[in-house]
Design a protein with these regions (language model features):
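Glycoside hydrolase catalytic-domain context in secreted enzymes
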Residues: 1-793, 797-813, 821-824
């Protein structure tokens, strides 16, 4: 920090203290409670603007859960981490800061830095990695980037929120060493290296104490030990105890206006249950945030002028390609690798799979944003091959992974019409799909919870196929469904036994009717929902969906058509995918199988075309039982809005696939280190201790399908020399291929007979290098002191473990290229 920066920081602190001195108890308590779903109250008398928050982490949705104000949609966080490039993450963060400033958002509710403890985790796609060091490095880059743009970040979910099942109440039981060395480590690294302006405490308990009330982890570890000076906000509806939360270090209870703070907090102070100094501490943290983002009069913002504009579409395309991981690339008939395709030589490409046409570009839940455009694989390849002489593209659906109803989307033009009890329209707006998700004040203009008696999702549907179309609903309450002007179902959906209040919405859809329709002939559709009285609820919300599923042709017939298309083509590209019923916030996965008959499709196509390339459009690992039967496998994660364009760039060789696996890819579900995420009597034991991810595979001598850190490019690298000290590792390598490329040099430490219980090896550091054909490059990589330390619970501190270490310069955890011996005193 420069002298000028320090001076500005002092001015901000003076402004914070001056503002705090002017507030009475009731106003202070009100400031700590959300005024609505996404903001804190303004206090004009001290020059405080309303602080506005918004979900991330791959875009900035803003304060409305609608497509009215589109947002850029970047690749999923796992895809971003796959680039193994903190500086690239920083650039992504700067773009999101630009989006936030455009939308009037002060604080982004991201990044998510929980770990890939189990591939079953419903929000696996929203987290970076199974490795704490990689997570901390990428997360630090992201936080630095967002805050470079003058927008605050909220690192979440602190801590132990690594699965969705019973997430509101589960007790994550984690021993001291894994808690410190694994699960807290990314948060600690980000606090140290990026100085985040906010953190979000999770719903769950850790070792018996609710995280929003966890005095030890928040007050003692996060603040006193690590030096965190930002604001601490609850996950939405996680704050449940006025005294417990304020004494546990929770600054802000969200969402409002009905929270455990506000009047309840002021009363607790007056009753002597809470010292006013605890309230002052929380208010000080909120005012400091306001000062940093420019929302407090008299305090200079950290960033006063908006940075230079960034081309969002171009960066989204670059990010996608940099995160694509080529895990297999075998030689085909002419002896060359399957990828990149030789489009200049012409030939026919058969593109197969439902996800090639209707791409899944992001995961479900609070990470959802509404991009202005989406480039599917079909769009991207069609555009890229249009000007390539002799090249042609065919498309066949092959097999559809969506065997369940989903929110009405393709072919639907819908709007929501809100009416009062007399039937008069009080508000209306367009819908991007059949999903209505209005939370807090996120309502169409003119509508209110007090006046709305019904909401009608209405519009037209232009079928893309002949046959029997299924329609359904999701949500709780009374519905009337009409198709073609006729009521086809009317009834009430009651609440089940779901512990998670969002689970009914995110849970299983209900089919209500089947209607035979004709391709290309529009039909009117309508779903009317009777609005219940929600005015007394702590969180006012309306959530329901009009669902649709197109005609389901026999899978064997679809696969047969795909086989014929593949047989006639020079190259077959099969896009396989998960669905929103497989990967989303609100629930965990049951297994790692691809939905539907997609495995059968791949095998059938590979049997007739030896040049079969499989593109895996999934946010987290899936089983690939056919992986040795195809020429190439490319993992694209949830690639964001420009995914199809980036895919064409990579397949045709215009761009090298830059990704390396941020998580181990199991050969089968049974091999995963953690295969159970359902709590027992409310407790989820982290019995694996330190051994998650690649650490567990190595400890159990299990070979995964693809190891942590694995990824192929379009060139080759020779590792030539390695020098290691306790502070740095120096590696020299040469690009021995015929084209420029990027390599990620991964440094692992392996202790030699030290007698300490810990993994056999772990990632200590990494660096990316670039070189042209025949060019050599040398990189010096700093080794963090923490790489040699373990947590000593008795001493309540970190202990440096001396002895002999093998230092490994590796292409992946399973591919060590050079080793050196290091004796550590």
């Amino acid at each position: 920090m420069t002298d000028a920066d320090q001076a500005r920081e002092q001015i901000r602190e003076y402004a914070v203290e001056a503002a705090l001195d002017k507030l009475d108890l009731d106003t202070k308590a009100r400031l700590l409670s959300g005024q609505d779903m996404w903001s804190l109250p303004a206090i004009p008398e001290i020059g405080l603007k309303s602080l506005v928050m918004s979900d991330g982490p791959i875009g900035v949705r803003g304060v409305r859960w609608t497509a009215d104000d589109p947002s850029i949609a970047l690749p999923s966080p796992t895809g971003l981490a796959a680039a193994w490039d903190p500086e690239l993450a920083r650039r992504a963060g700067r773009l999101l800061a630009q989006e936030a400033r455009r939308k009037g958002v002060h604080v982004l509710l991201a990044p998510t830095v929980n770990l890939h403890r189990s591939p079953l985790g419903g929000r696996h796609f929203e987290c970076y990695s199974e490795d704490p060091y990689l997570t901390g490095a990428v997360g630090s880059g992201y936080v630095n980037g967002v805050q470079d743009g003058g927008v605050g970040t909220t690192v979440k979910h602190f801590v132990g929120n690594d699965a969705e099942t019973e997430r509101f109440t589960v007790d994550s039981v984690i021993a001291p060493r894994p808690l410190r060395e694994v699960y807290l480590a990314p948060f600690e690294a980000i606090v140290a290296n990026a100085h985040p302006w906010g953190i979000m405490t999770a719903y769950n308990r850790v070792n018996g104490t609710t995280m929003t009330e966890h005095q030890y982890l928040v007050n003692e570890v996060l603040r006193a030990e690590w030096g965190f000076d930002g604001y601490n906000v609850s996950d939405w509806m996680a704050a449940r105890s006025t005294t417990g939360d304020i004494l546990g270090g929770l600054d802000v209870a969200m969402p409002g206006p009905q929270t455990v703070y506000g009047p309840a907090l002021a009363e607790a102070v007056r009753a002597g249950e809470v010292p006013e100094s605890a309230v002052d501490t929380a208010v000080r943290n909120v005012l400091r945030l306001a000062a940093r983002v420019g929302a407090l009069e008299g305090a200079p913002a950290v960033v006063e002028e908006a940075p230079a504009p960034i081309d969002g579409q171009a960066l989204a395309r670059e990010l996608a390609a940099r995160g694509f991981v080529l895990v297999r690339n075998e030689a085909v008939a002419d002896g060359s690798a399957a990828l990149p395709l030789d489009a200049a030589a012409g030939g026919t490409v058969a593109l197969l799979g439902a996800a090639a046409r209707d791409a899944r570009v992001l995961g479900g839940g609070s990470a959802v944003v509404f991009p202005e455009r989406i480039v599917s694989p079909l769009d991207g390849l069609t555009s890229a091959l249009r000007d390539r002489s002799g090249a042609s593209l065919t498309y066949t659906i092959g097999a559809d992974p969506s065997e369940e109803l989903t929110p009405a989307d393709k072919g639907f033009e819908l709007r929501a019409v809100c009416r009062d009890a007399s039937g008069a329209v009080v508000g209306e707006g367009t819908l991007p799909s059949g999903q209505v998700q209005w939370i807090g004040d996120d309502l169409p203009a003119g509508a209110s919870y007090e006046t709305m008696a019904s909401i009608e999702v209405t519009g037209t549907f232009l079928p893309r196929e002949n046959g029997e179309h299924a329609f359904g609903t999701r949500g709780l309450g009374a519905f009337t469904l009409a198709v073609g002007g006729e009521t086809v179902w009317e009834g009430v959906q009651e609440m089940g036994n779901e512990a998670d209040p969002f689970e009914a919405f995110f849970g299983a859809p209900s089919e209500r009717a089947r209607v035979t329709l004709t391709e290309g002939e529009p039909v009117e559709v309508s779903l009317t929902f009777q609005v219940p009285d929600v005015t007394a609820l702590p969180l006012k919300a309306i959530m329901f969906s009009l669902l649709h599923l197109g005609p389901q042709r026999e899978a064997d017939e679809l696969i047969a058509e795909a086989v014929e298309a593949a047989r006639a083509a020079d190259t077959a590209i099969v896009v396989v995918a998960t669905t929103e019923r497989v990967e989303s916030e609100g629930f965990d996965r049951k297994d790692l199988a691809l939905p539907g008959r997609q495995d059968d499709l791949v095998r059938a196509v590979a049997a007739v075309n030896p040049h079969t390339v499989v593109v895996v459009n999934a946010g987290s690992p899936v089983e690939l039982p056919w992986r040795d039967e195809v020429a190439a496998v490319l993992l694209t994660w949830f690639p964001g809005q420009e995914g199809g364009a980036a895919l064409a760039d990579v397949l045709l060789g215009d761009t090298e696939p830059g990704g390396r696996l941020p998580t181990t890819w199991p050969a089968r579900f049974a091999d995963a280190p953690v295969t159970e995420v359902v709590p027992t009597e409310g407790r989820l034991e982290y019995g694996e201790g330190l051994f998650i991810g690649y650490r567990a595979y190595e400890a159990r001598s299990i070979r995964p399908a693809f190891p942590f850190g694995h990824g192929l490019g379009y060139t080759d690298w020779a590792y030539e020399s390695l020098e290691a000290t306790a502070e740095t590792v120096r590696v020299r390598l040469t690009n021995t291929g015929a084209r420029p490329g990027r390599e990620v040099v991964q440094v692992y430490l392996a202790p030699v007979d030290d007698g300490v219980e810990r993994p056999a090896s772990w990632l200590a550091a990494f660096a990316g290098v670039e070189a042209g054909p025949g060019e050599s490059v040398e990189t010096e990589i700093a080794l963090p002191a923490r790489a040699f330390e373990i947590w000593d619970e008795e001493a309540r501190g970190w202990q440096r473990i001396g002895g002999t270490y093998e230092v490994r310069a590796s292409h992946s955890h399973g591919d060590t290229r050079l080793t050196a011996t290091l004796d550590l005193a």
